[in-house]
Amino acid sequence: MLRDVLTLSRHVLQQFGSFTAEAQDFSALMNRIALAGKMIARRLSQAGLIEGALGVTGSLNVQGEEQQQMDDYANRAFIRALEQTGLVCRLVSEEMKTPARLPENCSLSRLALMIDPLDGSSNIDANLSVGSIFSVLHPLEDRPEADNQDLLQPGRRQLAAGYILYGPSTQLVYSVGKGVHGFTLDPSLGEFILSRSDIRIPERGSVYSLNEGYFCQWSEGIQNYVRYVHRRDGYISRYSGALVADFHRILLQGGVYLYPGTQKKPEGKLRLMYEANPLAFLAEQAGGAATTGTEAILDIVPQSLHQRVPLIIGSRENVEEVLRCLEGSLVP
């Protein structure tokens, strides 16, 4: 039996409870983000068949990381989807040192979109899941635009956040601060249709997700957490190497995802503004928690657009378990 068809654009309007200009602009913005997701999903589905979809570009991105062909395509897809729309003035991306300014939009909108256009892109050559992450901000009016100071604001000020997961199906999950909702792309309609409403992360889950290859580089507290779960029944390790895919599992099934700092990189690897903040926003909206190990992710005042942070995110009880290991009150 077919379920009720509620499209993404209609759902956004329902979230605002009105047809105000703000609601319509947000609905249009989510549609353009969804359009970029459809473009990326189509390209990924053809990745083994067309030239220039697999492998690396031969250059490094602003993070000093080897850029995959699909990283570059995904970044351009978001820019193309938002040009000439009047919806977003600035686009901050993992793939660009400075924000892309869309001058034709700035007379109509001051909103900024923060994106990781393609998370986990090293998975593509092996045909594994990847994702896109996004966050919508309103620049602070009392801060100068120079050096993008007006964008450096805590994650609690996000207007909306979400991600698109490219897997067996293409799914979009988002929140405007009124719960977390999931949509599945119906290829026959070309529309994202509501498939999960008011998602709540379980208070506790069995999954822990982290790359244990870095064990020797972690702090004693993180090492003790790994020893703790190894020595007890009821814990399952799942790690794909794609943040969106691993977080999506935690969101639906419960558990905890960890990407802690290491001896070489105590600041962590994940970017605050367009990776940790959006997912932390979703986690808290769904009843979960997100922390660096010392402070809530959403309370951090960013110092730069590409700032990195450690991340511990997931079910409240699981996150608390990690924190107790860090403080030494829970021992293996």
Curated annotation (Swiss-Prot):
Where substrate is bound, by residue? 119-122, 211, 239, 257-259, 269
Q: What class of enzyme is it?
A: hydrolase
The residues that hold Mg(2+) 1 are 94, 116, 118
Give the CC-aspect GO terms.
cytosol
Task: Give the co-factor note.
Answer: Binds 2 magnesium ions per subunit.
Q: Which reaction does it catalyse?
A: beta-D-fructose 1,6-bisphosphate + H2O = beta-D-fructose 6-phosphate + phosphate
Alphabetically sorted, this entry's keywords are: Calvin cycle, Carbohydrate metabolism, Cytoplasm, Hydrolase, Magnesium, Metal-binding
Where in the cell does this protein reside? Cytoplasm
Q: Which GO terms describe its biological process?
A: fructose 1,6-bisphosphate metabolic process; fructose 6-phosphate metabolic process; fructose metabolic process; gluconeogenesis; reductive pentose-phosphate cycle; sucrose biosynthetic process
What pathway is this protein a component of? Carbohydrate biosynthesis; Calvin cycle
Keyword flag NAD: no
Might you give the EC number(s) for this enzyme?
3.1.3.11
State the source organism's domain of life. Answer: Bacteria
Molecular-function annotations in GO: fructose 1,6-bisphosphate 1-phosphatase activity; magnesium ion binding
Location (main, coarse):
cytoplasm
Swiss-Prot/TrEMBL cofactor(s): Mg(2+)
Q: Which residues bind Mg(2+) 2?
A: 116, 119, 275
Quaternary assembly: Homotetramer.
The similarity annotation says: Belongs to the FBPase class 1 family.
Protein name, UniProt field: Fructose-1,6-bisphosphatase class 1
State the species of origin.
Synechococcus sp. (strain JA-2-3B'a(2-13))
This protein's gene is called fbp
